[in-house]
A protein has these predicted regions:
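Acidic/glycine-rich phosphate/pyrophosphate-binding loops and surrounding catalytic core
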Residues: 87-137
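N-terminal helix initiation/capping motif
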Residues: 1-3
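Compact, glycine-rich, soluble single-domain proteins
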Residues: 6-95
Length: 137
C-alpha cells in the first residue's frame, strides 16, 4: 500500500473533498501535473478540467474550475471557483449548458471584449470537463 497524504478541494461555498489519498492529478496551465507524497512544494494555477485522485487503486474524478493549487510534502490544497463530483452532474443539463455557451462564443467579439472572451472560454472548458465526467468519457 502506498503512503497517503491529505488533499483538500475547496470552493468559495463549500469543502468538496477532504481525504487521505495516494496520488493527485490536476489540470495545470502548462498541462496536467501529478503529485505523490513528498512532492517538492509548489504553488500553481489550476485551469478548468478534470482533477483525479487515487484511492484504493481506483481513480476518482472531479470537474474543477479556475483556481490555485498549493503542494506541500504531505498535503495538497486546491482552491477553485467551482468543483463537482460525478454524481452531482446531469449529462443532459450540462450538454444544454455547453450548447448555450458555444452560441455565446460565436456572438462575442474577442477583440472588443478580451476579458469577456477569456471568461467565456473558461466557462466552456469547465462545461466540457463536466460533460466528459457526466457522460462517462
Amino acid at each position: 500500500m502506498s503512503e497517503k497524504f491529505k488533499v483538500e478541494v475547496v470552493t468559495p461555498t463549500r469543502v468538496v473533498l477532504d481525504k487521505e489519498v495516494e496520488e493527485v492529478i490536476a489540470p495545470g496551465i502548462m498541462g496536467e501535473f501529478g503529485v505523490l507524497i513528498g512532492h517538492t512544494p509548489m504553488l500553481t494555477f489550476v485551469k478548468p478540467g478534470v482533477l483525479s485522485y487515487l484511492e484504493n487503486d481506483k481513480f476518482i474524478k472531479f470537474a474543477v474550475g479556475e483556481g490555485f493549487c498549493e503542494v506541500l510534502a504531505d498535503r495538497v490544497s486546491v482552491l477553485v471557483d467551482e468543483a463537482y463530483a460525478v454524481e452531482e452532474l446531469d449529462a443532459v443539463a450540462v450538454s444544454s449548458e455547453l450548447q448555450g455557451l458555444e452560441q455565446q462564443l460565436v456572438a462575442i467579439d474577442a477583440t472588443a471584449d478580451p476579458e469577456g472572451y477569456r471568461k467565456l472560454t473558461s466557462k466552456l472548458k469547465m462545461a466540457r470537463a463536466k460533460l466528459s465526467l457526466a457522460s462517462g468519457s
